Amino acid sequence: MITRRQSTEIRLGNLTIGGSAPISVQSMTKTDTRNIPATIAQIKELEECGCEIIRLAIPDMEAASALKSIRPKVKIPIVADIHFDYRLALASLSAGVDGLRLNPGNIGDPERVKAVVKSAKEREIPIRIGVNAGSLPKDLPPELTIAQKMVKAAMGHIKILEGLDFGLIKVSLKAFDVPTTIEAYTQIASLIPYPLHVGITETGTPKTGLVRSAVGIGNLLYMGIGDTIRVSLTAPPQEEVFAAYEILKSLNLRQRGPILVSCPTCSRTEVDIVGIASRVQEALNKIDKPIRVAVMGCAVNGPGESKEADLGIACGKGQGLLFRKGEKIAVVPEDELVDALLREIASL
């Protein structure tokens, strides 16, 4: 049983973050924010696959202005990602964003920081302090580890906001190195009450990035650390959302859509179990029912090994078994197994 760290609650648009609220799934658009139709279309696609928070890069005033057209067209909270220029933060707030990702120490002039905080406070808009290992301040003590530097940098940004009586704060500390990221989060989790956004940065393409993210995010979540998560991949953002839910489901922290259980195959397998499992997974991706489905490679061990599945098939040469909760309900010709399984799923 995972005991979650108790953080303060904040509101991000229509979403509660922290406290006892469910761990939220976030992604980031990969369109040019200035391309309004493309950005709206991508956000709507992400909404359909379960994304709950979307972050948009705001590189210039044209992108900030685009938010005024984007915000009314989408349902999920929008976070504007701001670097250095406080005017972009002010313009994004005026455009109606639900949150900012901003490091106040990078803005420079304290009066500019005050202007951003004043505007955010008036609108009750939270600010996420996002520290990345690759862009740490140069004046940090050299004897500190990277994780310690990340925490020190984050605490510096936090103190600026707290000094302006601003408490709608969320924090992230990301690195490519998984142990460094885990160390940074575990340190800061005991120092602050604010919600934590968890992720591993720049993990790469899905083949490697999914593994790094699952190990890093999964370890932190198992320790109870994390209120929102993002799986950062060099891939379409829908894949990030799918992966995030799989991590949450694997730890029994969230349940969205089906879980596919399939065997790794062995010499007893007499059918194309890889192809069958892939076909079933493709069909399950379009289903929201929180069920467990099994695809097993032999009729000898299949039903017993997947007895916790709501439905499943055990495939044999020429025919296979269709079963529910480990109990056989039908013998089905091999070429009809997948269709029979999908019909049973639809009837649930």
Curated annotation (Swiss-Prot):
This is 4-hydroxy-3-methylbut-2-en-1-yl diphosphate synthase (flavodoxin). One of its GO terms (molecular function) is 4-hydroxy-3-methylbut-2-enyl-diphosphate synthase activity (flavodoxin). It catalyses: (2E)-4-hydroxy-3-methylbut-2-enyl diphosphate + oxidized [flavodoxin] + H2O + 2 H(+) = 2-C-methyl-D-erythritol 2,4-cyclic diphosphate + reduced [flavodoxin]. Pfam families: GcpE. Belongs to the IspG family. It is an enzyme of class 1 (oxidoreductase). NCBIfam families: ispG_gcpE, PRK00366.1. Its cofactor is [4Fe-4S] cluster. InterPro entries: Dihydropteroate_synth-like_sf (IPR011005), IspG_bac (IPR016425), IspG_bac-typ (IPR004588), NO2/SO3_Rdtase_4Fe4S_sf (IPR045854), RibuloseP-bd_barrel (IPR011060). Disulfide bonds: none annotated. It comes from Dehalococcoides mccartyi (strain CBDB1). Keywords: 4Fe-4S, Iron, Iron-sulfur, Isoprene biosynthesis, Metal-binding, Oxidoreductase. Its EC number is 1.17.7.3. Pathway: Isoprenoid biosynthesis; isopentenyl diphosphate biosynthesis via DXP pathway; isopentenyl diphosphate from 1-deoxy-D-xylulose 5-phosphate: step 5/6. The keyword Nucleotidyltransferase does not apply. One of its GO terms (biological process) is isopentenyl diphosphate biosynthetic process, methylerythritol 4-phosphate pathway. Binds 1 [4Fe-4S] cluster. Converts 2C-methyl-D-erythritol 2,4-cyclodiphosphate (ME-2,4cPP) into 1-hydroxy-2-methyl-2-(E)-butenyl 4-diphosphate. [4Fe-4S] cluster binds at C263, C266, C298, E305. SUPFAM superfamilies: Nitrite and sulphite reductase 4Fe-4S domain-like, Ribulose-phoshate binding barrel.
